[in-house]
Curated annotation (Swiss-Prot):
Protein name: Protein fem-1 homolog C
SUPFAM superfamilies, alphabetized: Ankyrin repeat, TPR-like
Gene name tied to this protein: fem1c
Keywords: ANK repeat, Repeat, TPR repeat, Ubl conjugation pathway
Pathway stated in the Swiss-Prot or TrEMBL entry: Protein modification; protein ubiquitination
Pfam families assigned to the protein according to its UniProt record, in alphabetical order: Ank_2 (PF12796), Ank_5 (PF13857)
ANK repeat start-end pairs: 2-31, 40-70, 82-111, 115-144, 148-177, 181-210, 213-242, 481-523, 527-556
Comment on protein domains: The first seven ANK repeats at the N-terminus (1-242) are essnetial for recognition of Lys/Arg-Xaa-Arg and -Lys/Arg-Xaa-Xaa-Arg C-degrons.
Length: 617
């Protein structure tokens, strides 16, 4: 074990005697350097503070001149916090004495993590009241919010820490501050079921505001299923009749899909129905639907107490009611609307009703693409779910275990929607598309193409498929490392796109159809690797031969001056199956000589040949 690791382990484990022995006779500059070096993303002081070793913290600061501010990576409850200063780690872990020591040694009380979380927020999160008080006494700013605009008061409310919330309010915390998404502390109480804190916030002048999705705290409580909050707020005289009705109906939908309590749902729907009909001269009717939705099996919302009573005999109809109610009240842009449509579809798939699942998922996907930004993680998740479902259906069909077939139209429809998502993304210039999400979307498309190759189709369908693949390639999308779709098709890492296996890559079939549809065989990635280079790295001679037959230049070099043949593994059979001499022309040999001897060639030979020589650099 090297000295750096030994020092790190000793600091983490609080072994002061061992640490002092390790640093014995070391030059001061060497010790200071050791204090700033990181193991697994953390300095020795950060680890000592995280685990509450006060004597170690004091020793590192006083004797080793450790920096009191250098942040690093620390783990709390399975989550890695990046850029956490020692004071943040000690505050989060509840080590008051260490917090005192760090502040005495000059730690900045408002120094934040990479997500802009302060030590005060860390203490509020885990309910360390004494540390909260101590930090505030030492000028901690109550109003510094994290990157989501979430304040110390908000997190205290969400986590149900009443005493901390009360202390912050007494110290002047802004009770009506809004997060980036428009949440207030009242929303956090509603989402966590913290009724006592909510009542306290109202005494301090908290207002019932809507968030970015148009959600009031009352609706937030309905979505999360906190009946205590819903009951309290529906009795509030300031809550309108319509708001009460919507809250009770939405709570019923939550009981169906989240709590799986159909009788509980009926109870709240009956209360709402009674409220709708409480004034015979002014019945509050539900809006008439413009169209009935095929994905919901053409269900319509019940309008009378009698219709509601009849639901008890039809659980499936109740589940459709829940989806209809949620979409009406929350609207299509709220994440819960599409989430529970997808959830219901998954339940159908688990019971073998794949057609209902596909219809619901298609409806949810349309909703997401119409309302979310391009390459939203939620949309990508929907597309991936389709790929996984179709893969499962094809496998079970092949084994003779499944009566339902995957149709060309189903698969092709999702491929078209996936290509549309890429089209939306590449047209978005500000901000540019997220490379990780774009790479994932490209990989999903290749998996869908792979699955399509397993489904029989007519000549017209085959033409339509190739038309769409051509349109996809003409968008010239580039994923991580500037990979083109052809690079991804010949890379084994494309296999790992989700939790469940879909298709295996490199894929000869996908490579072949991409080439047939016009993929550039000599396109380069960020390191000037062609698809041939990537195929060589993956030791796939069949695909390499296919690429060469399609015009791939065999001895072109990447930015490390390597040809594809140089990248083949000596231990693999592929090296023996690829014969460079069969693919090397006299023109190639001449270009290599020009490059090797640095012979002037620009403006001496035709422009076409200049680009040819460049391939051999």
């Amino acid at each position: 074990m090297d000295l750096k690791t030994a020092v790190f382990n000793a600091a983490r484990d609080g072994k002061l005697r061992l640490l002092s022995k390790l640093l014995e006779n070391k030059a001061k500059d060497d010790v200071v350097l050791l204090m700033s070096e990181k193991t697994n993303g953390a300095t020795p002081l950060l680890m000592a503070a995280r685990y509450g070793h006060l004597d170690m913290v004091d020793y590192l600061l006083d004797q080793c001149s450790a920096s009191v501010e250098i942040g690093g990576s620390v783990n709390f409850d399975g989550e890695t916090i990046e850029g956490a200063p020692p004071l943040w780690a000690a505050s989060a872990a509840g080590h008051l004495k260490v917090v005192r020591s760090l502040l005495v040694h000059g730690a900045s009380v408002n120094n934040t993590t990479l997500t802009n979380s302060t030590p005060l927020r860390a203490a509020c999160f885990d309910g360390h009241l004494e540390i909260v008080k101590y930090l505030v006494e030492h000028k901690a700013d109550l109003e510094v919010a994290n990157r989501h605009g979430h304040t110390c008061l908000m997190i205290s409310c969400y986590k149900g820490h009443k005493e901390i919330a009360q202390f912050l309010l007494e110290k002047g915390a802004d009770v009506n501050r809004k997060s980036v998404k428009g949440n207030t502390a009242l929303h956090d109480c509603a989402e966590s079921g913290s009724l006592e804190i909510m009542q306290m916030l109202l005494k301090y002048g908290a207002r019932m505001e809507k968030d970015g999705y148009g959600m009031t705290p009352l609706l937030s409580a309905s979505v999360t299923g906190h009946t205590n909050i819903v009951d309290f707020l529906t009795q509030n005289p300031q809550t309108s009749k319509n708001e009460r009705i919507n809250a009770l109906e939405l709570l019923g939908a939550t009981f169906v899909d989240k709590k799986r309590d159909l009788l509980g749902a009926l109870k709240y729907w009956k209360r709402a129905m009674d409220m709708r009909h409480s004034d015979r001269t002014n019945i509050v009717s539900k809006p008439e639907p413009q169209t009935l939705i095929m994905a919901y099996d053409y269900a319509r919302e019940v309008n009378t107490a009698e219709e509601l009573d009849n639901l008890i005999a039809d659980p499936d109809e109740m589940r459709m009611q829940a989806l209809l109610i949620r979409e009406r009240i929350l609207g299509p842009s709220h994440p819960d609307t599409s989430y529970y449509i997808r959830y219901r579809g998954a339940v159908y798939a688990d019971s073998g009703n794949f057609k209902r699942c596909i219809n619901l998922w298609k409806y949810a996907l349309d909703m997401q693409q119409n309302n979310l930004d391009p390459l939203s993680p939620m949309t990508a998740s929907s597309l991936l779910s389709f790929a996984e479902l179709f893969s499962f259906m094809l496998q079970d069909r092949a084994k003779g275990l499944l009566g339902t077939t995957v149709t060309f139209d189903d698969l092709m429809g999702i491929l078209c929607k996936s290509v549309m998502e890429i089209d939306r993304a590449v047209k978005q210039t500000a901000p540019p598309p997220d490379q990780v999400q774009l790479n994932k979307a490209l990989s999903i498309i290749l998996h869908l193409i792979c699955l399509l190759e397993k489904v029989p189709c007519s000549p017209d369908q085959d033409h339509f498929k190739k038309q769409n693949i051509y349109r996809f390639l003409k968008l010239h999308p580039k994923g991580k490392n500037n990979f083109s779709p052809l690079h991804l098709a010949v890379d084994k890492n494309t296999t790992c796109v989700g939790r469940y296996p879909v298709c295996k890559f490199p894929s000869f079939q996908v490579t072949a159809i991409l080439l047939e549809c016009g993929a550039d065989v000599n396109v380069r990635d960020a390191e000037q690797n062609s698809p041939l280079h990537v195929a060589a790295l993956n030791n796939h001679p069949d695909i390499m031969n296919l690429l060469v037959k399609s015009g791939a230049h065999f001895d072109s070099t990447n930015s490390h001056n390597q040809t594809a043949c140089d990248l083949l593994d000596e231990k693999e059979m592929a090296k023996n199956l690829i014969q460079p001499i069969n693919h090397t022309t006299l023109q190639c040999l001449a270009a290599r000589v020009i490059v090797k001897h640095n012979i002037q060639y620009k403006q001496e030979i035709p422009e076409k040949l200049e680009s040819f020589v460049l391939l051999h650099r």
